[in-house]
Amino acid sequence: MKKVFILLALKYYILNSIIRNGENLYKKIVIPTDGSDVSLEAAKHAINIAKEFDAEVYAIYVVDVSPFVGLPAEGSWELISELLKEEGQEALKKVKKMAEEWGVKIHTEMLEGVPANEIVEFAEKKKADLIVMGTTGKTGLERILLGSVAERVIKNAHCPVLVVKKPKKE
């Protein structure tokens, strides 16, 4: 009986810390996805939170144009762009299916630009309360050269960011 009371008290405390003045803090959640395992893991967390707090979810895929700046517009860029958009549609389809299975209202959108910038701007435009995203955990030279999209989103976002790490293989 004591354990049940403690668990109920803990749940009450958590719910009260997330709900202010009778209003849910999480009404709109943004899920940036790239189709990777870690981004799908992040989507699971986001959808679970959305289900618990009756929030809407916005799944976005950003076609990263930064590596292709300066390439001739015709020919190669168009082909690459189409391939990236197809990849994006598949990634968004997976997240949408997951949300629909959980009964969570979802919107999907494809964007073009620098991923961190687009994610932050989209979240601000939608007045998101939370961004949930995955991170691959780059280290060393790779991180110095490429940076971390998640790190830049954390630094620039107007709302909290939940970052889900790649699960360790057992």
UniProtKB/Swiss-Prot annotation:
Gene3D superfamilies assigned to the protein according to its UniProt record, in alphabetical order: HUPs
Organism: Methanocaldococcus jannaschii (strain ATCC 43067 / DSM 2661 / JAL-1 / JCM 10045 / NBRC 100440) (Methanococcus jannaschii)
Similarity comment text for this entry: Belongs to the universal stress protein A family.
Pfam families reported for this sequence: Usp
PANTHER family: STRESS RESPONSE PROTEIN NHAX (PTHR46268), UNIVERSAL STRESS PROTEIN UP12 (PTHR46268:SF6)
Name this polypeptide is given: Universal stress protein MJ0531
